Amino acid sequence: MKIVGAEGQEHEEFDIPFKLWRKFAAKRRLRYQSWEEGKEVMLNKLDKDLLTDFKAFAARFSSRPRPSKIFGTSSSEAISGEGNGQSGRGAARNHPRARTRCGATSTNHGGRVVPVAVAAASPRAPKKAAEAASRVRGRRRLVTRCAGAAHTQPAAIDLDGGFGHCVQKEKEAPLSQARAPAIPRGDRGQRGRKRRCGATNGGFQQPTGANQARQGR
């Protein structure tokens, strides 16, 4: 762009975008006229100090980090011409400030995602879950009775503390209430057959001819 005085005698040419001049003029509240889409600007009074300040302002503005809409700053990249023609997204992604210590960037910087350390699932996790479920079910007290005991009182088993031993408390019962030991289910038929075969000999079958030999004696 070119800046000229009101009289048209003095002029200065700058390799600075016109948008940056508009920001500088708004900050200084300068009155000017422009034409040819900002390629030429005319001031009422062309001051050397004003031009020096404008150059310093352009240098400071150009040295700022490449902004984008993600950073929430102004579009100085398009104004200053930085970024080698890259868009705001590409400039923000390649900017050093957008990178984290781990080498990646978050979703707020250029759309990249920071890798989050996720704890690996333990192979013992299903087993622990099953144990927890068994403890919940074990809180219901289970009543058992051991077969073969004369008279036992059912004991409550509490599995909250883990797998323990079954402890049964025996109490003395009157003789009239005493019962015979429980017979396993599979031996009931066998005992009946033994009685029928040899009821006179204590329930055991004698060899063939044993009774005849005893009577002969």
Swiss-Prot record:
Species, as recorded: Human adenovirus C serotype 2 (HAdV-2)
Record function comment: Might play a role in viral replication since it is associated with viral replication centers. Seems to have an effect on DBP localization.
Keyword Phosphoprotein: no
Family membership: Belongs to the adenoviridae U exon protein family.
Iron among keywords: no
Protein name (record): U exon protein
Cell compartment(s), UniProt: Host nucleus, Host nucleoplasm; Host nucleus, Host nucleolus
Superkingdom of the organism of origin: Viruses
GO CC terms: host cell nucleolus; host cell nucleoplasm
Polar residues bias (residue ranges): 202-217
Main localization of the protein described in the UniProt heading: host cell
Induction: Expressed abundantly in the late phase of the viral replicative cycle.
Region spans: Disordered: 68-110, 170-217
Keywords noted in UniProt: Host nucleus, Late protein
Lineage: Viruses, Varidnaviria, Bamfordvirae, Preplasmiviricota, Tectiliviricetes
